[in-house]
């Protein structure tokens, strides 16, 4: 067996991954009518053929009608998606790779004049700079419905043969609850960190009840918004610990920064010409502080950088 650290198997809960290489979620914008049909399936399967241990698809699939994609994404709130998901997962598994999907509710990070023309929702009326639509302040019955929407979507994904689900938190509705900059609710879902995290944990509880223990659940989230008044590094570490201690998830997928502006987005997802792996040390700090499986993706675009990330224990 090769001594290359990238090629060593990795145990994630009940899954044995054949190496340490994962393609994290991103959206190629290939869905047809919100479904992962032939072109989408072929795009995803090629990663498995290339030898990755796991590929994550969708960036991100919508769980609710009032979370209309701003470009062509999967619609996880439709029952008809299940057989299309099954065709894709079967094809990936035949190539020896695991497959997960990323689910989200966009909250304010979308527009009302798309999809079904429904009001967009957030824990405050503050609009996002990038999308600029003013959200309705979320109400109790909205929260209950959206939690159920996440659970329903999770059940569909398991029925479709997925190995797990990753919740997209940063910048989207879950993060809008967690961040003090975007949460102006009173009562059980606003104010203290415990309250601001309640929505996220309630979503995971509902999903776990549907999918059982033999299914991977994780979260891609920001542990430092790098914004005055937002989630800072110290609070981000506490969020990370609380996510682990909840017992509801199996890994963390950590990023640093914010995506509500174009400059902020390029710091989180660096473009060509920018520094490689700018947040790798930060992700390593989260892993060290939590002693918990930690994923990270932010311009780790070459084998040498990826190998260093694993070999150095980051």
Regions found by a protein language model. Name each.
Residues 1-314:
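Flavin-dependent oxidoreductase catalytic cores
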């Amino acid at each position: 067996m090769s001594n290359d650290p990238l090629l060593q198997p990795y145990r994630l809960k009940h899954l044995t991954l054949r190496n340490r290489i994962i393609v994290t979620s991103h959206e190629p914008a290939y869905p047809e009518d919100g479904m992962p049909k032939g072109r989408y399936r072929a795009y995803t399967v090629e990663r498995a053929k290339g030898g990755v241990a796991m590929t994550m698809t969708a960036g991100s699939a919508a769980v609710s009608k009032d979370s209309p994609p701003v470009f062509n994404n999967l619609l996880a709130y439709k029952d008809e998606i299940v057989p299309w998901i099954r065709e894709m997962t079967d094809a990936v598994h035949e190539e020896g790779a695991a497959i997960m999907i990323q689910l989200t509710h966009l909250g304010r990070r979308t527009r009302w004049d798309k999809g079904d023309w429904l009001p967009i929702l957030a824990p405050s009326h503050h609009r996002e700079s990038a999308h600029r639509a003013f959200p309705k302040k979320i109400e109790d019955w909205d929260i209950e419905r959206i939690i159920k929407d996440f659970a329903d979507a999770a059940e569909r994904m398991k029925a479709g043969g997925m190995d797990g689900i990753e919740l997209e938190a940063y910048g989207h509705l879950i993060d809008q609850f967690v961040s003090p900059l975007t949460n102006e609710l009173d009562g059980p879902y606003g104010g203290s960190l415990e309250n601001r995290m309640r929505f996220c944990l309630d979503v995971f509880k509902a999903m776990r009840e549907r999918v059982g223990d033999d299914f991977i659940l994780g979260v891609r989230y920001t542990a430092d918004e790098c914004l005055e008044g937002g989630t800072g590094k110290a609070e981000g570490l506490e969020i990370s610990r609380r996510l682990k201690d909840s017992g509801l998830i199996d890994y963390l997928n950590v990023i640093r920064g914010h995506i509500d502006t174009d400059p902020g987005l390029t710091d989180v997802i660096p473009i060509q010409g920018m520094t490689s792996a700018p947040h790798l040390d930060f992700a390593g700090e989260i892993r060290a502080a939590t002693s918990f499986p930690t994923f990270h993706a932010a311009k780790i675009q070459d084998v040498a950088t990826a190998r260093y990330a694993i070999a150095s224990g980051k």
